[in-house]
C-alpha cells in the first residue's frame, strides 16, 4: 500500500511538472511571439520562464511535501500521547474500529485487548486504522522537488525547441502541434495507472493546452494596444 502511495505521489509530481511546463511555456511564448516577433526575445523569454518556473515549482513541491510530513508526524505524536495517557479510551476506539471493519464483536474485543498489551503494536494499530497514516512517515520532499524540477524543464522545452530551428511563423505552428501531441501522449500515458479512457484524458490535456494558446494569443494581440 505504501509502495503504491509512493508511486502515485511521484506520478503526481511528474505529470504536474510536464503538463505545467508545456502549457505555461506554450502560452507565454505564443503571446510574446505575437506581440514582439523578435526571435531572440522569444527564445530568451522561454528560457527565463523555464528556468525560473522550474525552480519555483520544485521549491513549492518541497515545501508542500514537508508540510504534509510535519502534519503527519504531529498526528502520530499526538496519538502516541493518547495511547499512553488514555489506554482504556483508545482501546475502546480500536474495538469500535474493528467492529466497523466487520470483525465479530467478541473477536474485536480480543484483538483490541491483545494489541493494547503491546505499546508498539497498540500505537501502530491506532495510527494505521484511526489516522490512516504510516507510523513513521517517509520524507520524499527532496525526491518530489527533483521530479518536479526535471519534469517542468522537460515539459517547457517541448514548445520552445522549434524556435531553435525555424523562424517565428513556422516555429509557432510546430510549437503548438508538438505541444498538443505531447499533452495528448501525457494524458494517455497516465491512464495506464488510473484506468481511465486514454483518449478522454488525452483530449482533456489538449483542451488545457488550447486554453493556454488562446490566452497567450489574446494577450499578445491586446498588449501592444494597451501599452502603446
What does each model-identified segment do?
Residues 1-6, 66-148:
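Cytosol/matrix-facing amphipathic helices and coiled-coil assembly/linker segments
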Residues 10-28, 135-161:
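Transmembrane alpha-helical segments and their cytosolic interface motifs
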